[in-house]
Amino acid sequence: MSDSVILRSIKKFGEENDGFESDKSYNNDKKSRLQDEKKGDGVRVGFFQLFRFSSSTDIWLMFVGSLCAFLHGIAQPGVLLIFGTMTDVFIDYDVELQELQIPGKACVNNTIVWTNSSLNQNMTNGTRCGLLNIESEMIKFASYYAGIAVAVLITGYIQICFWVIAAARQIQKMRKFYFRRIMRMEIGWFDCNSVGELNTRFSDDINKINDAIADQMALFIQRMTSTICGFLLGFFRGWKLTLVIISVSPLIGIGAATIGLSVSKFTDYELKAYAKAGVVADEVISSMRTVAAFGGEKREVERYEKNLVFAQRWGIRKGIVMGFFTGFVWCLIFLCYALAFWYGSTLVLDEGEYTPGTLVQIFLSVIVGALNLGNASPCLEAFATGRAAATSIFETIDRKPIIDCMSEDGYKLDRIKGEIEFHNVTFHYPSRPEVKILNDLNMVIKPGEMTALVGPSGAGKSTALQLIQRFYDPCEGMVTVDGHDIRSLNIQWLRDQIGIVEQEPVLFSTTIAENIRYGREDATMEDIVQAAKEANAYNFIMDLPQQFDTLVGEGGGQMSGGQKQRVAIARALIRNPKILLLDMATSALDNESEAMVQEVLSKIQHGHTIISVAHRLSTVRAADTIIGFEHGTAVERGTHEELLERKGVYFTLVTLQSQGNQALNEEDIKDATEDDMLARTFSRGSYQDSLRASIRQRSKSQLSYLVHEPPLAVVDHKSTYEEDRKDKDIPVQEEVEPAPVRRILKFSAPEWPYMLVGSVGAAVNGTVTPLYAFLFSQILGTFSIPDKEEQRSQINGVCLLFVAMGCVSLFTQFLQGYAFAKSGELLTKRLRKFGFRAMLGQDIAWFDDLRNSPGALTTRLATDASQVQGAAGSQIGMIVNSFTNVTVAMIIAFSFSWKLSLVILCFFPFLALSGATQTRMLTGFASRDKQALEMVGQITNEALSNIRTVAGIGKERRFIEALETELEKPFKTAIQKANIYGFCFAFAQCIMFIANSASYRYGGYLISNEGLHFSYVFRVISAVVLSATALGRAFSYTPSYAKAKISAARFFQLLDRQPPISVYNTAGEKWDNFQGKIDFVDCKFTYPSRPDSQVLNGLSVSISPGQTLAFVGSSGCGKSTSIQLLERFYDPDQGKVMIDGHDSKKVNVQFLRSNIGIVSQEPVLFACSIMDNIKYGDNTKEIPMERVIAAAKQAQLHDFVMSLPEKYETNVGSQGSQLSRGEKQRIAIARAIVRDPKILLLDEATSALDTESEKTVQVALDKAREGRTCIVIAHRLSTIQNADIIAVMAQGVVIEKGTHEELMAQKGAYYKLVTTGSPIS
C-alpha cells in the first residue's frame, strides 16, 4: 500500500518536477533582480506609494490635516491683502501731512486748498484730507490680524497633529508588514541578505520614510498652497508685474528640482554605505570574544571605517549640491526684488496703473509664493530620502517567498508514520550554485527507527536534514514523507511534526522555562519539568537561584555548551515530535549526560522516526540503521555489524576512531572491579537512580548575566514572549542627561576650521533678512516723496543693493552648505568610529549586560552618530544665522524707534517659551523613542540572527507577536508627541500675527501722536518680526537638536567609561622570553553580574612551559571559565593567574593575548574569504599566502579548499553559514596555528568533527602542541589521554590531577568516569 502511494506521489509530482527547480528559480530571480538593480539604479518608489499602508482612518486624518494645512497656507497671502491696503493708508496719510506742511495750504471741506484767494493751476490736483483717522484705521487692521492669528492657531495644530498621528499609524503598520514578510522568507533568501543590513533597514530606513510622510507633508501642503495663492493673488491684482516677477520662477523650479533629485541619489548611496558599515558592526559585536581573543579590534575598526568613508563622501557631495542650489535660489529671489521694484515703480509713477499698496501686494504675494516654494525644498529632500529608503523596504515587502513558512496551502495528513525518502535529490545552496552538495541522493528512512547518518565533513548530512525541514527545496528530485512530496504538504504542519536539536543550539534571551515552552506553546509547567528531567537538565536548573525562571542571556550565551544543549534537547522533546532530527546533538555533552540522553532517545524511539548525524561511535552504534555518506551521495546502508563486514566508509571511520581510544584498553577495563561493573549497569539501567547520582553542586555562574528579581509564580497557561519580557525586570537603557553643547563643540574641535568658515557664511546670510527689511521700508518711504525724480533715484539705488545682496547670498549660502556638510559628515564618521572603537575596547563583562546586546549596540551606532549632527552640523549654521539675524534686526529697530521695538519685544518671551517647551518635551520623547526602538531592535536581531532555529521550531508568529506588542510603545510616544509638537508649531506660527496686530496698532499711535514716519514703523516691525520668524524657524529644528544631545550623551558615556580590562591600555608588563608557564593560584571567581554564584572556588593548578593540561569535569563546572580568566576576559575576584611568574592583572592585555591561540567548541568565522579568516589569526602584520597555506595543510583543510571553485577566495557566508561544522572548525584551527602562539587553548576543538577529520585534525593539533603550553577541554577521553596533566574539576576546584595512568591507578573520580561514565562529584 505504502509503495503504491509513493509511486502515485512520484508520478503526480514528477510531471511538475521538471520545472520545479526552486533554488534555480531563486537564483535566476536573484540574478535578474541584481541585473534590474544595475540597469535601473535610479528606479524609485512612486511618491503616493509611500502611503500604501494607510487605512480609511489614516486617509481621513490626512484629509482633515491637509484641509487645515490648505487653510493655513491661504492665511499668508490673505494677510497681504490687508497689508497692501494698510500701506496705501500710511502713504496717503503721509502725503496729506507733507502737503499740509506746505505754506499756503489748508484742509477745507475734506480737500486741501490754497488759502490765498488767487486760484492756482495746482488746485486741480487737490488732495482729499481730514478723512483719515490713522489710529482707528490701525485698530481695524489689528483686529484682522488677530482673527487670522486665531485661525492659524487652530489649523496649524490640526495639520501637524493629524499628519504625525497618521504617519505613526502607517509606520507602525509598515514595520509590522516588513518584519512579517522577512519572517516568511525562505532560508535561501537569508543566505543572500545579511542580518545586519536588514536590522539597519528596519531602524534607519523606515525612520526616513516616517520623516517623509509625517509633518513634512503638512508643511509641504501649507507652503505649496501659499505659493499657488500668492501667484493667483498677484495675477488678480496686476498681471503685468506678476508676469515679470515670475519670469524667473522656472529657474527657481529648476534649482529646487535639482536639489530634490541630487539629494535622493546621494542619500541612496550614503544609505548603502552605512548599511554595509552596519553589517560589519553587527557581525563584530556578535563575535566579540573571538575579536578580543585574536586582537582584531584595530582591524575591525579599520574595516568599519572603510565603509564610513564612502558614506562621508556622498554626504559631503550632498551638502555641496544643497548649498549651491540654495544660494542659487536666494540669488534669483533678490534679483526678482530688484526687477520687481524697478519695473513696478514705473507702473506706479509713470503710468499710474497701480497704487503703492497694490505694488506691494503684487510683489509680496509673488515673493511669498516663491519663498514658500523655496521653503518646500527641505520637504522635497525628505520625500526624496523617504522614497530612496522605501525602495529596498517595499521590494522586500512585495517579494513572494519561494518557500512560504506561514502559507495555509498544502495538505495536513491525519496520521503520520514518519517514513522519509529521498528520490534522486540533487542540491546546491542558492548563494553557492557552483558547489553541488547533494548529488543524486537516494535513501529511505523507515518509520519508528533510529537512523544514523555518518560520513566526512561536507558530505551533505546536515544538508539532508535541512531539506527534510524544507528550509530549501531540491534542485532536482524530491523528498517525500509517508509517500507525499513535502512540497505538497503544509509547511507549518510539517515542521510541527519535526523536533530538531543542533550542535550549536540557539536559546532565546528569556527564561529557561520559556525556552523549553518554545517547543510547544500549550505546555504546562509539569510538561516543562518532565522534559527537563528527560533531557538530564533538571538538576542543574534546580541549582540555579531562579531555577526555571532564570534568564539565559543573549543567545543563551551565558550558559555552558552542555547546559545549552540539554535545554535545547528538552525543547525538542516537549514537542513529542514524530520525526526527531539530531544534528550532532550530544557532541557538547560529557559522557554521563550523553549516556542519559541516549537512554531517553531509546525510550521515546517507539513510534518516532529519529535521524541522527553524529561522529561519536557510542551514538551511532545505538542506531537501527546506519547510512554512510560520501560526496553528497548515500553509498552504504545497514547495521553496525553489517557495515563493519562490508569494510566501506563506515568501517574506515570506526577503525580510525577505535585507534584513538587506546586509553580504554583492555587492561583499564580489566582493572575495574566487579562493584564498578555493577555500578555501571546500575547507573545506566535505572534512570531515576542515575538522576539522583548526578545531583551535585554544578556551576551556577556560567550564566554571567542574570537579573535579580523574585521568582515568577509557576503558572500552567500559555505565556507569551512579551509577557515574559514585561514580567522580568529587564533593565532598560539607563537615563542620561542631555550632553552640554560645550562638550559636543569641544569634541568637534578638528572640524572647527570648517565650522568657522560655515559660521561666517551663516552670519552673512543672517544679516540678509534685516537688511531686506531696511531696503523694503526704504522703498515704501520713497512713494510719499513729492519729487518724482528723487523717488526714481532712490528706488534705483535700492534695486542695485538688492542685486548686490543676491550675488553675496549665492556665495555665502554655498559656503555655509559645503562647510557644515563637511564638518557634520567628518564628525559623524569620527563619532561612529570612536563609538565602535570604544565598544570594542570594553571588557567582556560589559557585553554580558543585557542592555549592551548586539542588537541594541548596532541600533545605537546606526542612529546616534547621525543624530549628533543635529547639534554640531548644519544646526550650528542655523543658530549662527538666527543670532546674527536677531542682533542686526535689534540694532536697526532700536536705531529708528526704541518704543515700538520694546512693544514688539514683549512677544519674544512667548516665542522663546514655545521653542523651550518644544525642546524640553521632545528631548524626553527622543530618549523614550530610542529606548523603545532599541527593544524592538533586540527582538529583530534575535529573530533574524537565529532564523534557522526560529523556522525549525515554527515560532515565526511568536516573534512577530512580540515585535508588534513592543511597537505599541513608540507608537504611543508618537501620538503624545503629535499633540505637543502640533500645539507648539501652531503657537509659534500664530504669535507672529498677534505681534503684527499689536505692533501696527501701537505704530498708528506713534505716527498720530509722536510724528513717527510710517516707513520707520514698517522698518522696525519688519526687522523684528522677520528676525523672530527666523528664530521660530531655528526652533522648528528642536526635535533633531534634542535627539542630538541625548545621542551625544550616550556616546560620551561610552567614550568616558574606563573598562577594568582595557585592550587599548598600553601600560602593563611585557617581556621578551615568553615561556608559557601558567599557575592558577587559589582562584575564586563569580561573574560580575551574578555575584551570588561562585564559579571557581579556589582553583589551583600549574602547567610548565610546553606541557599539556586537560581539564575534565561535568558540564558547567568552570572549565571554560578558567580559559576566560587566562585570556583576561575577566579577572579573578581572589587569587591570581600567574603567567611566567607575572600576575596576569599586571600584564599588558594585548601582549598577553598575542601569545595565546584559541580554538572554541563553536567557532566564529567572519563573512569574508577563507584566506581572510585564517589571516585573522595574527592581526599584528600582513600574513603571506605561504603561511596561510601551511596552516591550512596542518589543519587538514588545504585539500578541501582547493576543491572549491574560488579556493581560498571563497566567501564563508554570514557566521560561516556556507560551510559544514567540520570545515568551519578546521578553518578555526588553521587560524590558531597561523598565530604561532606560545599558549594554545583547545575548548572542545574536535567535538564538531567526524571521526576521519577528528583523527587527522588530532594529528595536526598534536603537532601544533609541540613546544607550546596547551590547555585542553574535552569530553572525549581519546582527546585527553596523552595530556601531561589531567585535572579533574568539580564545583570550581580541582579534585584530582595527574597523568592518565596515575589517575587510573588512584581509582578515584577520573577512573570512575572512564570506566562507567559516572558523574564527577
From Swiss-Prot:
<keyword id="KW-0067">ATP-binding</keyword>
<dbReference type="GO" id="GO:0015126">
    <property type="term" value="F:canalicular bile acid transmembrane transporter activity"/>
</dbReference>
<keyword id="KW-0225">Disease variant</keyword>
<dbReference type="Pfam" id="PF00005">
    <property type="entry name" value="ABC_tran"/>
</dbReference>
<keyword id="KW-0967">Endosome</keyword>
<feature type="domain" description="ABC transmembrane type-1 1">
    <location>
        <begin position="62"/>
        <end position="385"/>
    </location>
</feature>
<feature type="modified residue" description="Phosphoserine">
    <location>
        <position position="704"/>
    </location>
</feature>
<comment type="function">
    <text>Catalyzes the transport of the major hydrophobic bile salts, such as taurine and glycine-conjugated cholic acid across the canalicular membrane of hepatocytes in an ATP-dependent manner, therefore participates in hepatic bile acid homeostasis and consequently to lipid homeostasis through regulation of biliary lipid secretion in a bile salts dependent manner. Transports taurine-conjugated bile salts more rapidly than glycine-conjugated bile salts.</text>
</comment>
<feature type="topological domain" description="Cytoplasmic">
    <location>
        <begin position="169"/>
        <end position="215"/>
    </location>
</feature>
<dbReference type="GO" id="GO:0015125">
    <property type="term" value="F:bile acid transmembrane transporter activity"/>
</dbReference>
<feature type="transmembrane region" description="Helical">
    <location>
        <begin position="354"/>
        <end position="374"/>
    </location>
</feature>
<dbReference type="GO" id="GO:0042632">
    <property type="term" value="P:cholesterol homeostasis"/>
</dbReference>
<dbReference type="GO" id="GO:0008559">
    <property type="term" value="F:ABC-type xenobiotic transporter activity"/>
</dbReference>
<feature type="modified residue" description="Phosphoserine">
    <location>
        <position position="701"/>
    </location>
</feature>
<feature type="topological domain" description="Extracellular">
    <location>
        <begin position="84"/>
        <end position="147"/>
    </location>
</feature>
<dbReference type="GO" id="GO:0005886">
    <property type="term" value="C:plasma membrane"/>
</dbReference>
<dbReference type="GO" id="GO:0006631">
    <property type="term" value="P:fatty acid metabolic process"/>
</dbReference>
<feature type="compositionally biased region" description="Basic and acidic residues">
    <location>
        <begin position="21"/>
        <end position="37"/>
    </location>
</feature>
<dbReference type="GO" id="GO:0016567">
    <property type="term" value="P:protein ubiquitination"/>
</dbReference>
<dbReference type="GO" id="GO:0046691">
    <property type="term" value="C:intracellular canaliculus"/>
</dbReference>
<feature type="topological domain" description="Cytoplasmic">
    <location>
        <begin position="912"/>
        <end position="979"/>
    </location>
</feature>
<feature type="binding site">
    <location>
        <begin position="1113"/>
        <end position="1120"/>
    </location>
    <ligand>
        <name>ATP 2</name>
    </ligand>
</feature>
<feature type="topological domain" description="Cytoplasmic">
    <location>
        <begin position="816"/>
        <end position="869"/>
    </location>
</feature>
<dbReference type="GO" id="GO:0015432">
    <property type="term" value="F:ABC-type bile acid transporter activity"/>
</dbReference>
<feature type="transmembrane region" description="Helical">
    <location>
        <begin position="1012"/>
        <end position="1032"/>
    </location>
</feature>
<dbReference type="GO" id="GO:0031998">
    <property type="term" value="P:regulation of fatty acid beta-oxidation"/>
</dbReference>
<dbReference type="GO" id="GO:0006855">
    <property type="term" value="P:xenobiotic transmembrane transport"/>
</dbReference>
<feature type="transmembrane region" description="Helical">
    <location>
        <begin position="756"/>
        <end position="776"/>
    </location>
</feature>
<dbReference type="GO" id="GO:0016887">
    <property type="term" value="F:ATP hydrolysis activity"/>
</dbReference>
<keyword id="KW-0677">Repeat</keyword>
<feature type="region of interest" description="Interaction with HAX1">
    <location>
        <begin position="651"/>
        <end position="672"/>
    </location>
</feature>
<dbReference type="InterPro" id="IPR003439">
    <property type="entry name" value="ABC_transporter-like_ATP-bd"/>
</dbReference>
<dbReference type="GO" id="GO:0120189">
    <property type="term" value="P:positive regulation of bile acid secretion"/>
</dbReference>
<feature type="topological domain" description="Extracellular">
    <location>
        <begin position="1001"/>
        <end position="1011"/>
    </location>
</feature>
<feature type="topological domain" description="Cytoplasmic">
    <location>
        <begin position="375"/>
        <end position="755"/>
    </location>
</feature>
<dbReference type="GO" id="GO:0016324">
    <property type="term" value="C:apical plasma membrane"/>
</dbReference>
<dbReference type="InterPro" id="IPR036640">
    <property type="entry name" value="ABC1_TM_sf"/>
</dbReference>
<dbReference type="Pfam" id="PF00664">
    <property type="entry name" value="ABC_membrane"/>
</dbReference>
<keyword id="KW-1133">Transmembrane helix</keyword>
<feature type="glycosylation site" description="N-linked (GlcNAc...) asparagine">
    <location>
        <position position="116"/>
    </location>
</feature>
<keyword id="KW-1278">Translocase</keyword>
<feature type="transmembrane region" description="Helical">
    <location>
        <begin position="891"/>
        <end position="911"/>
    </location>
</feature>
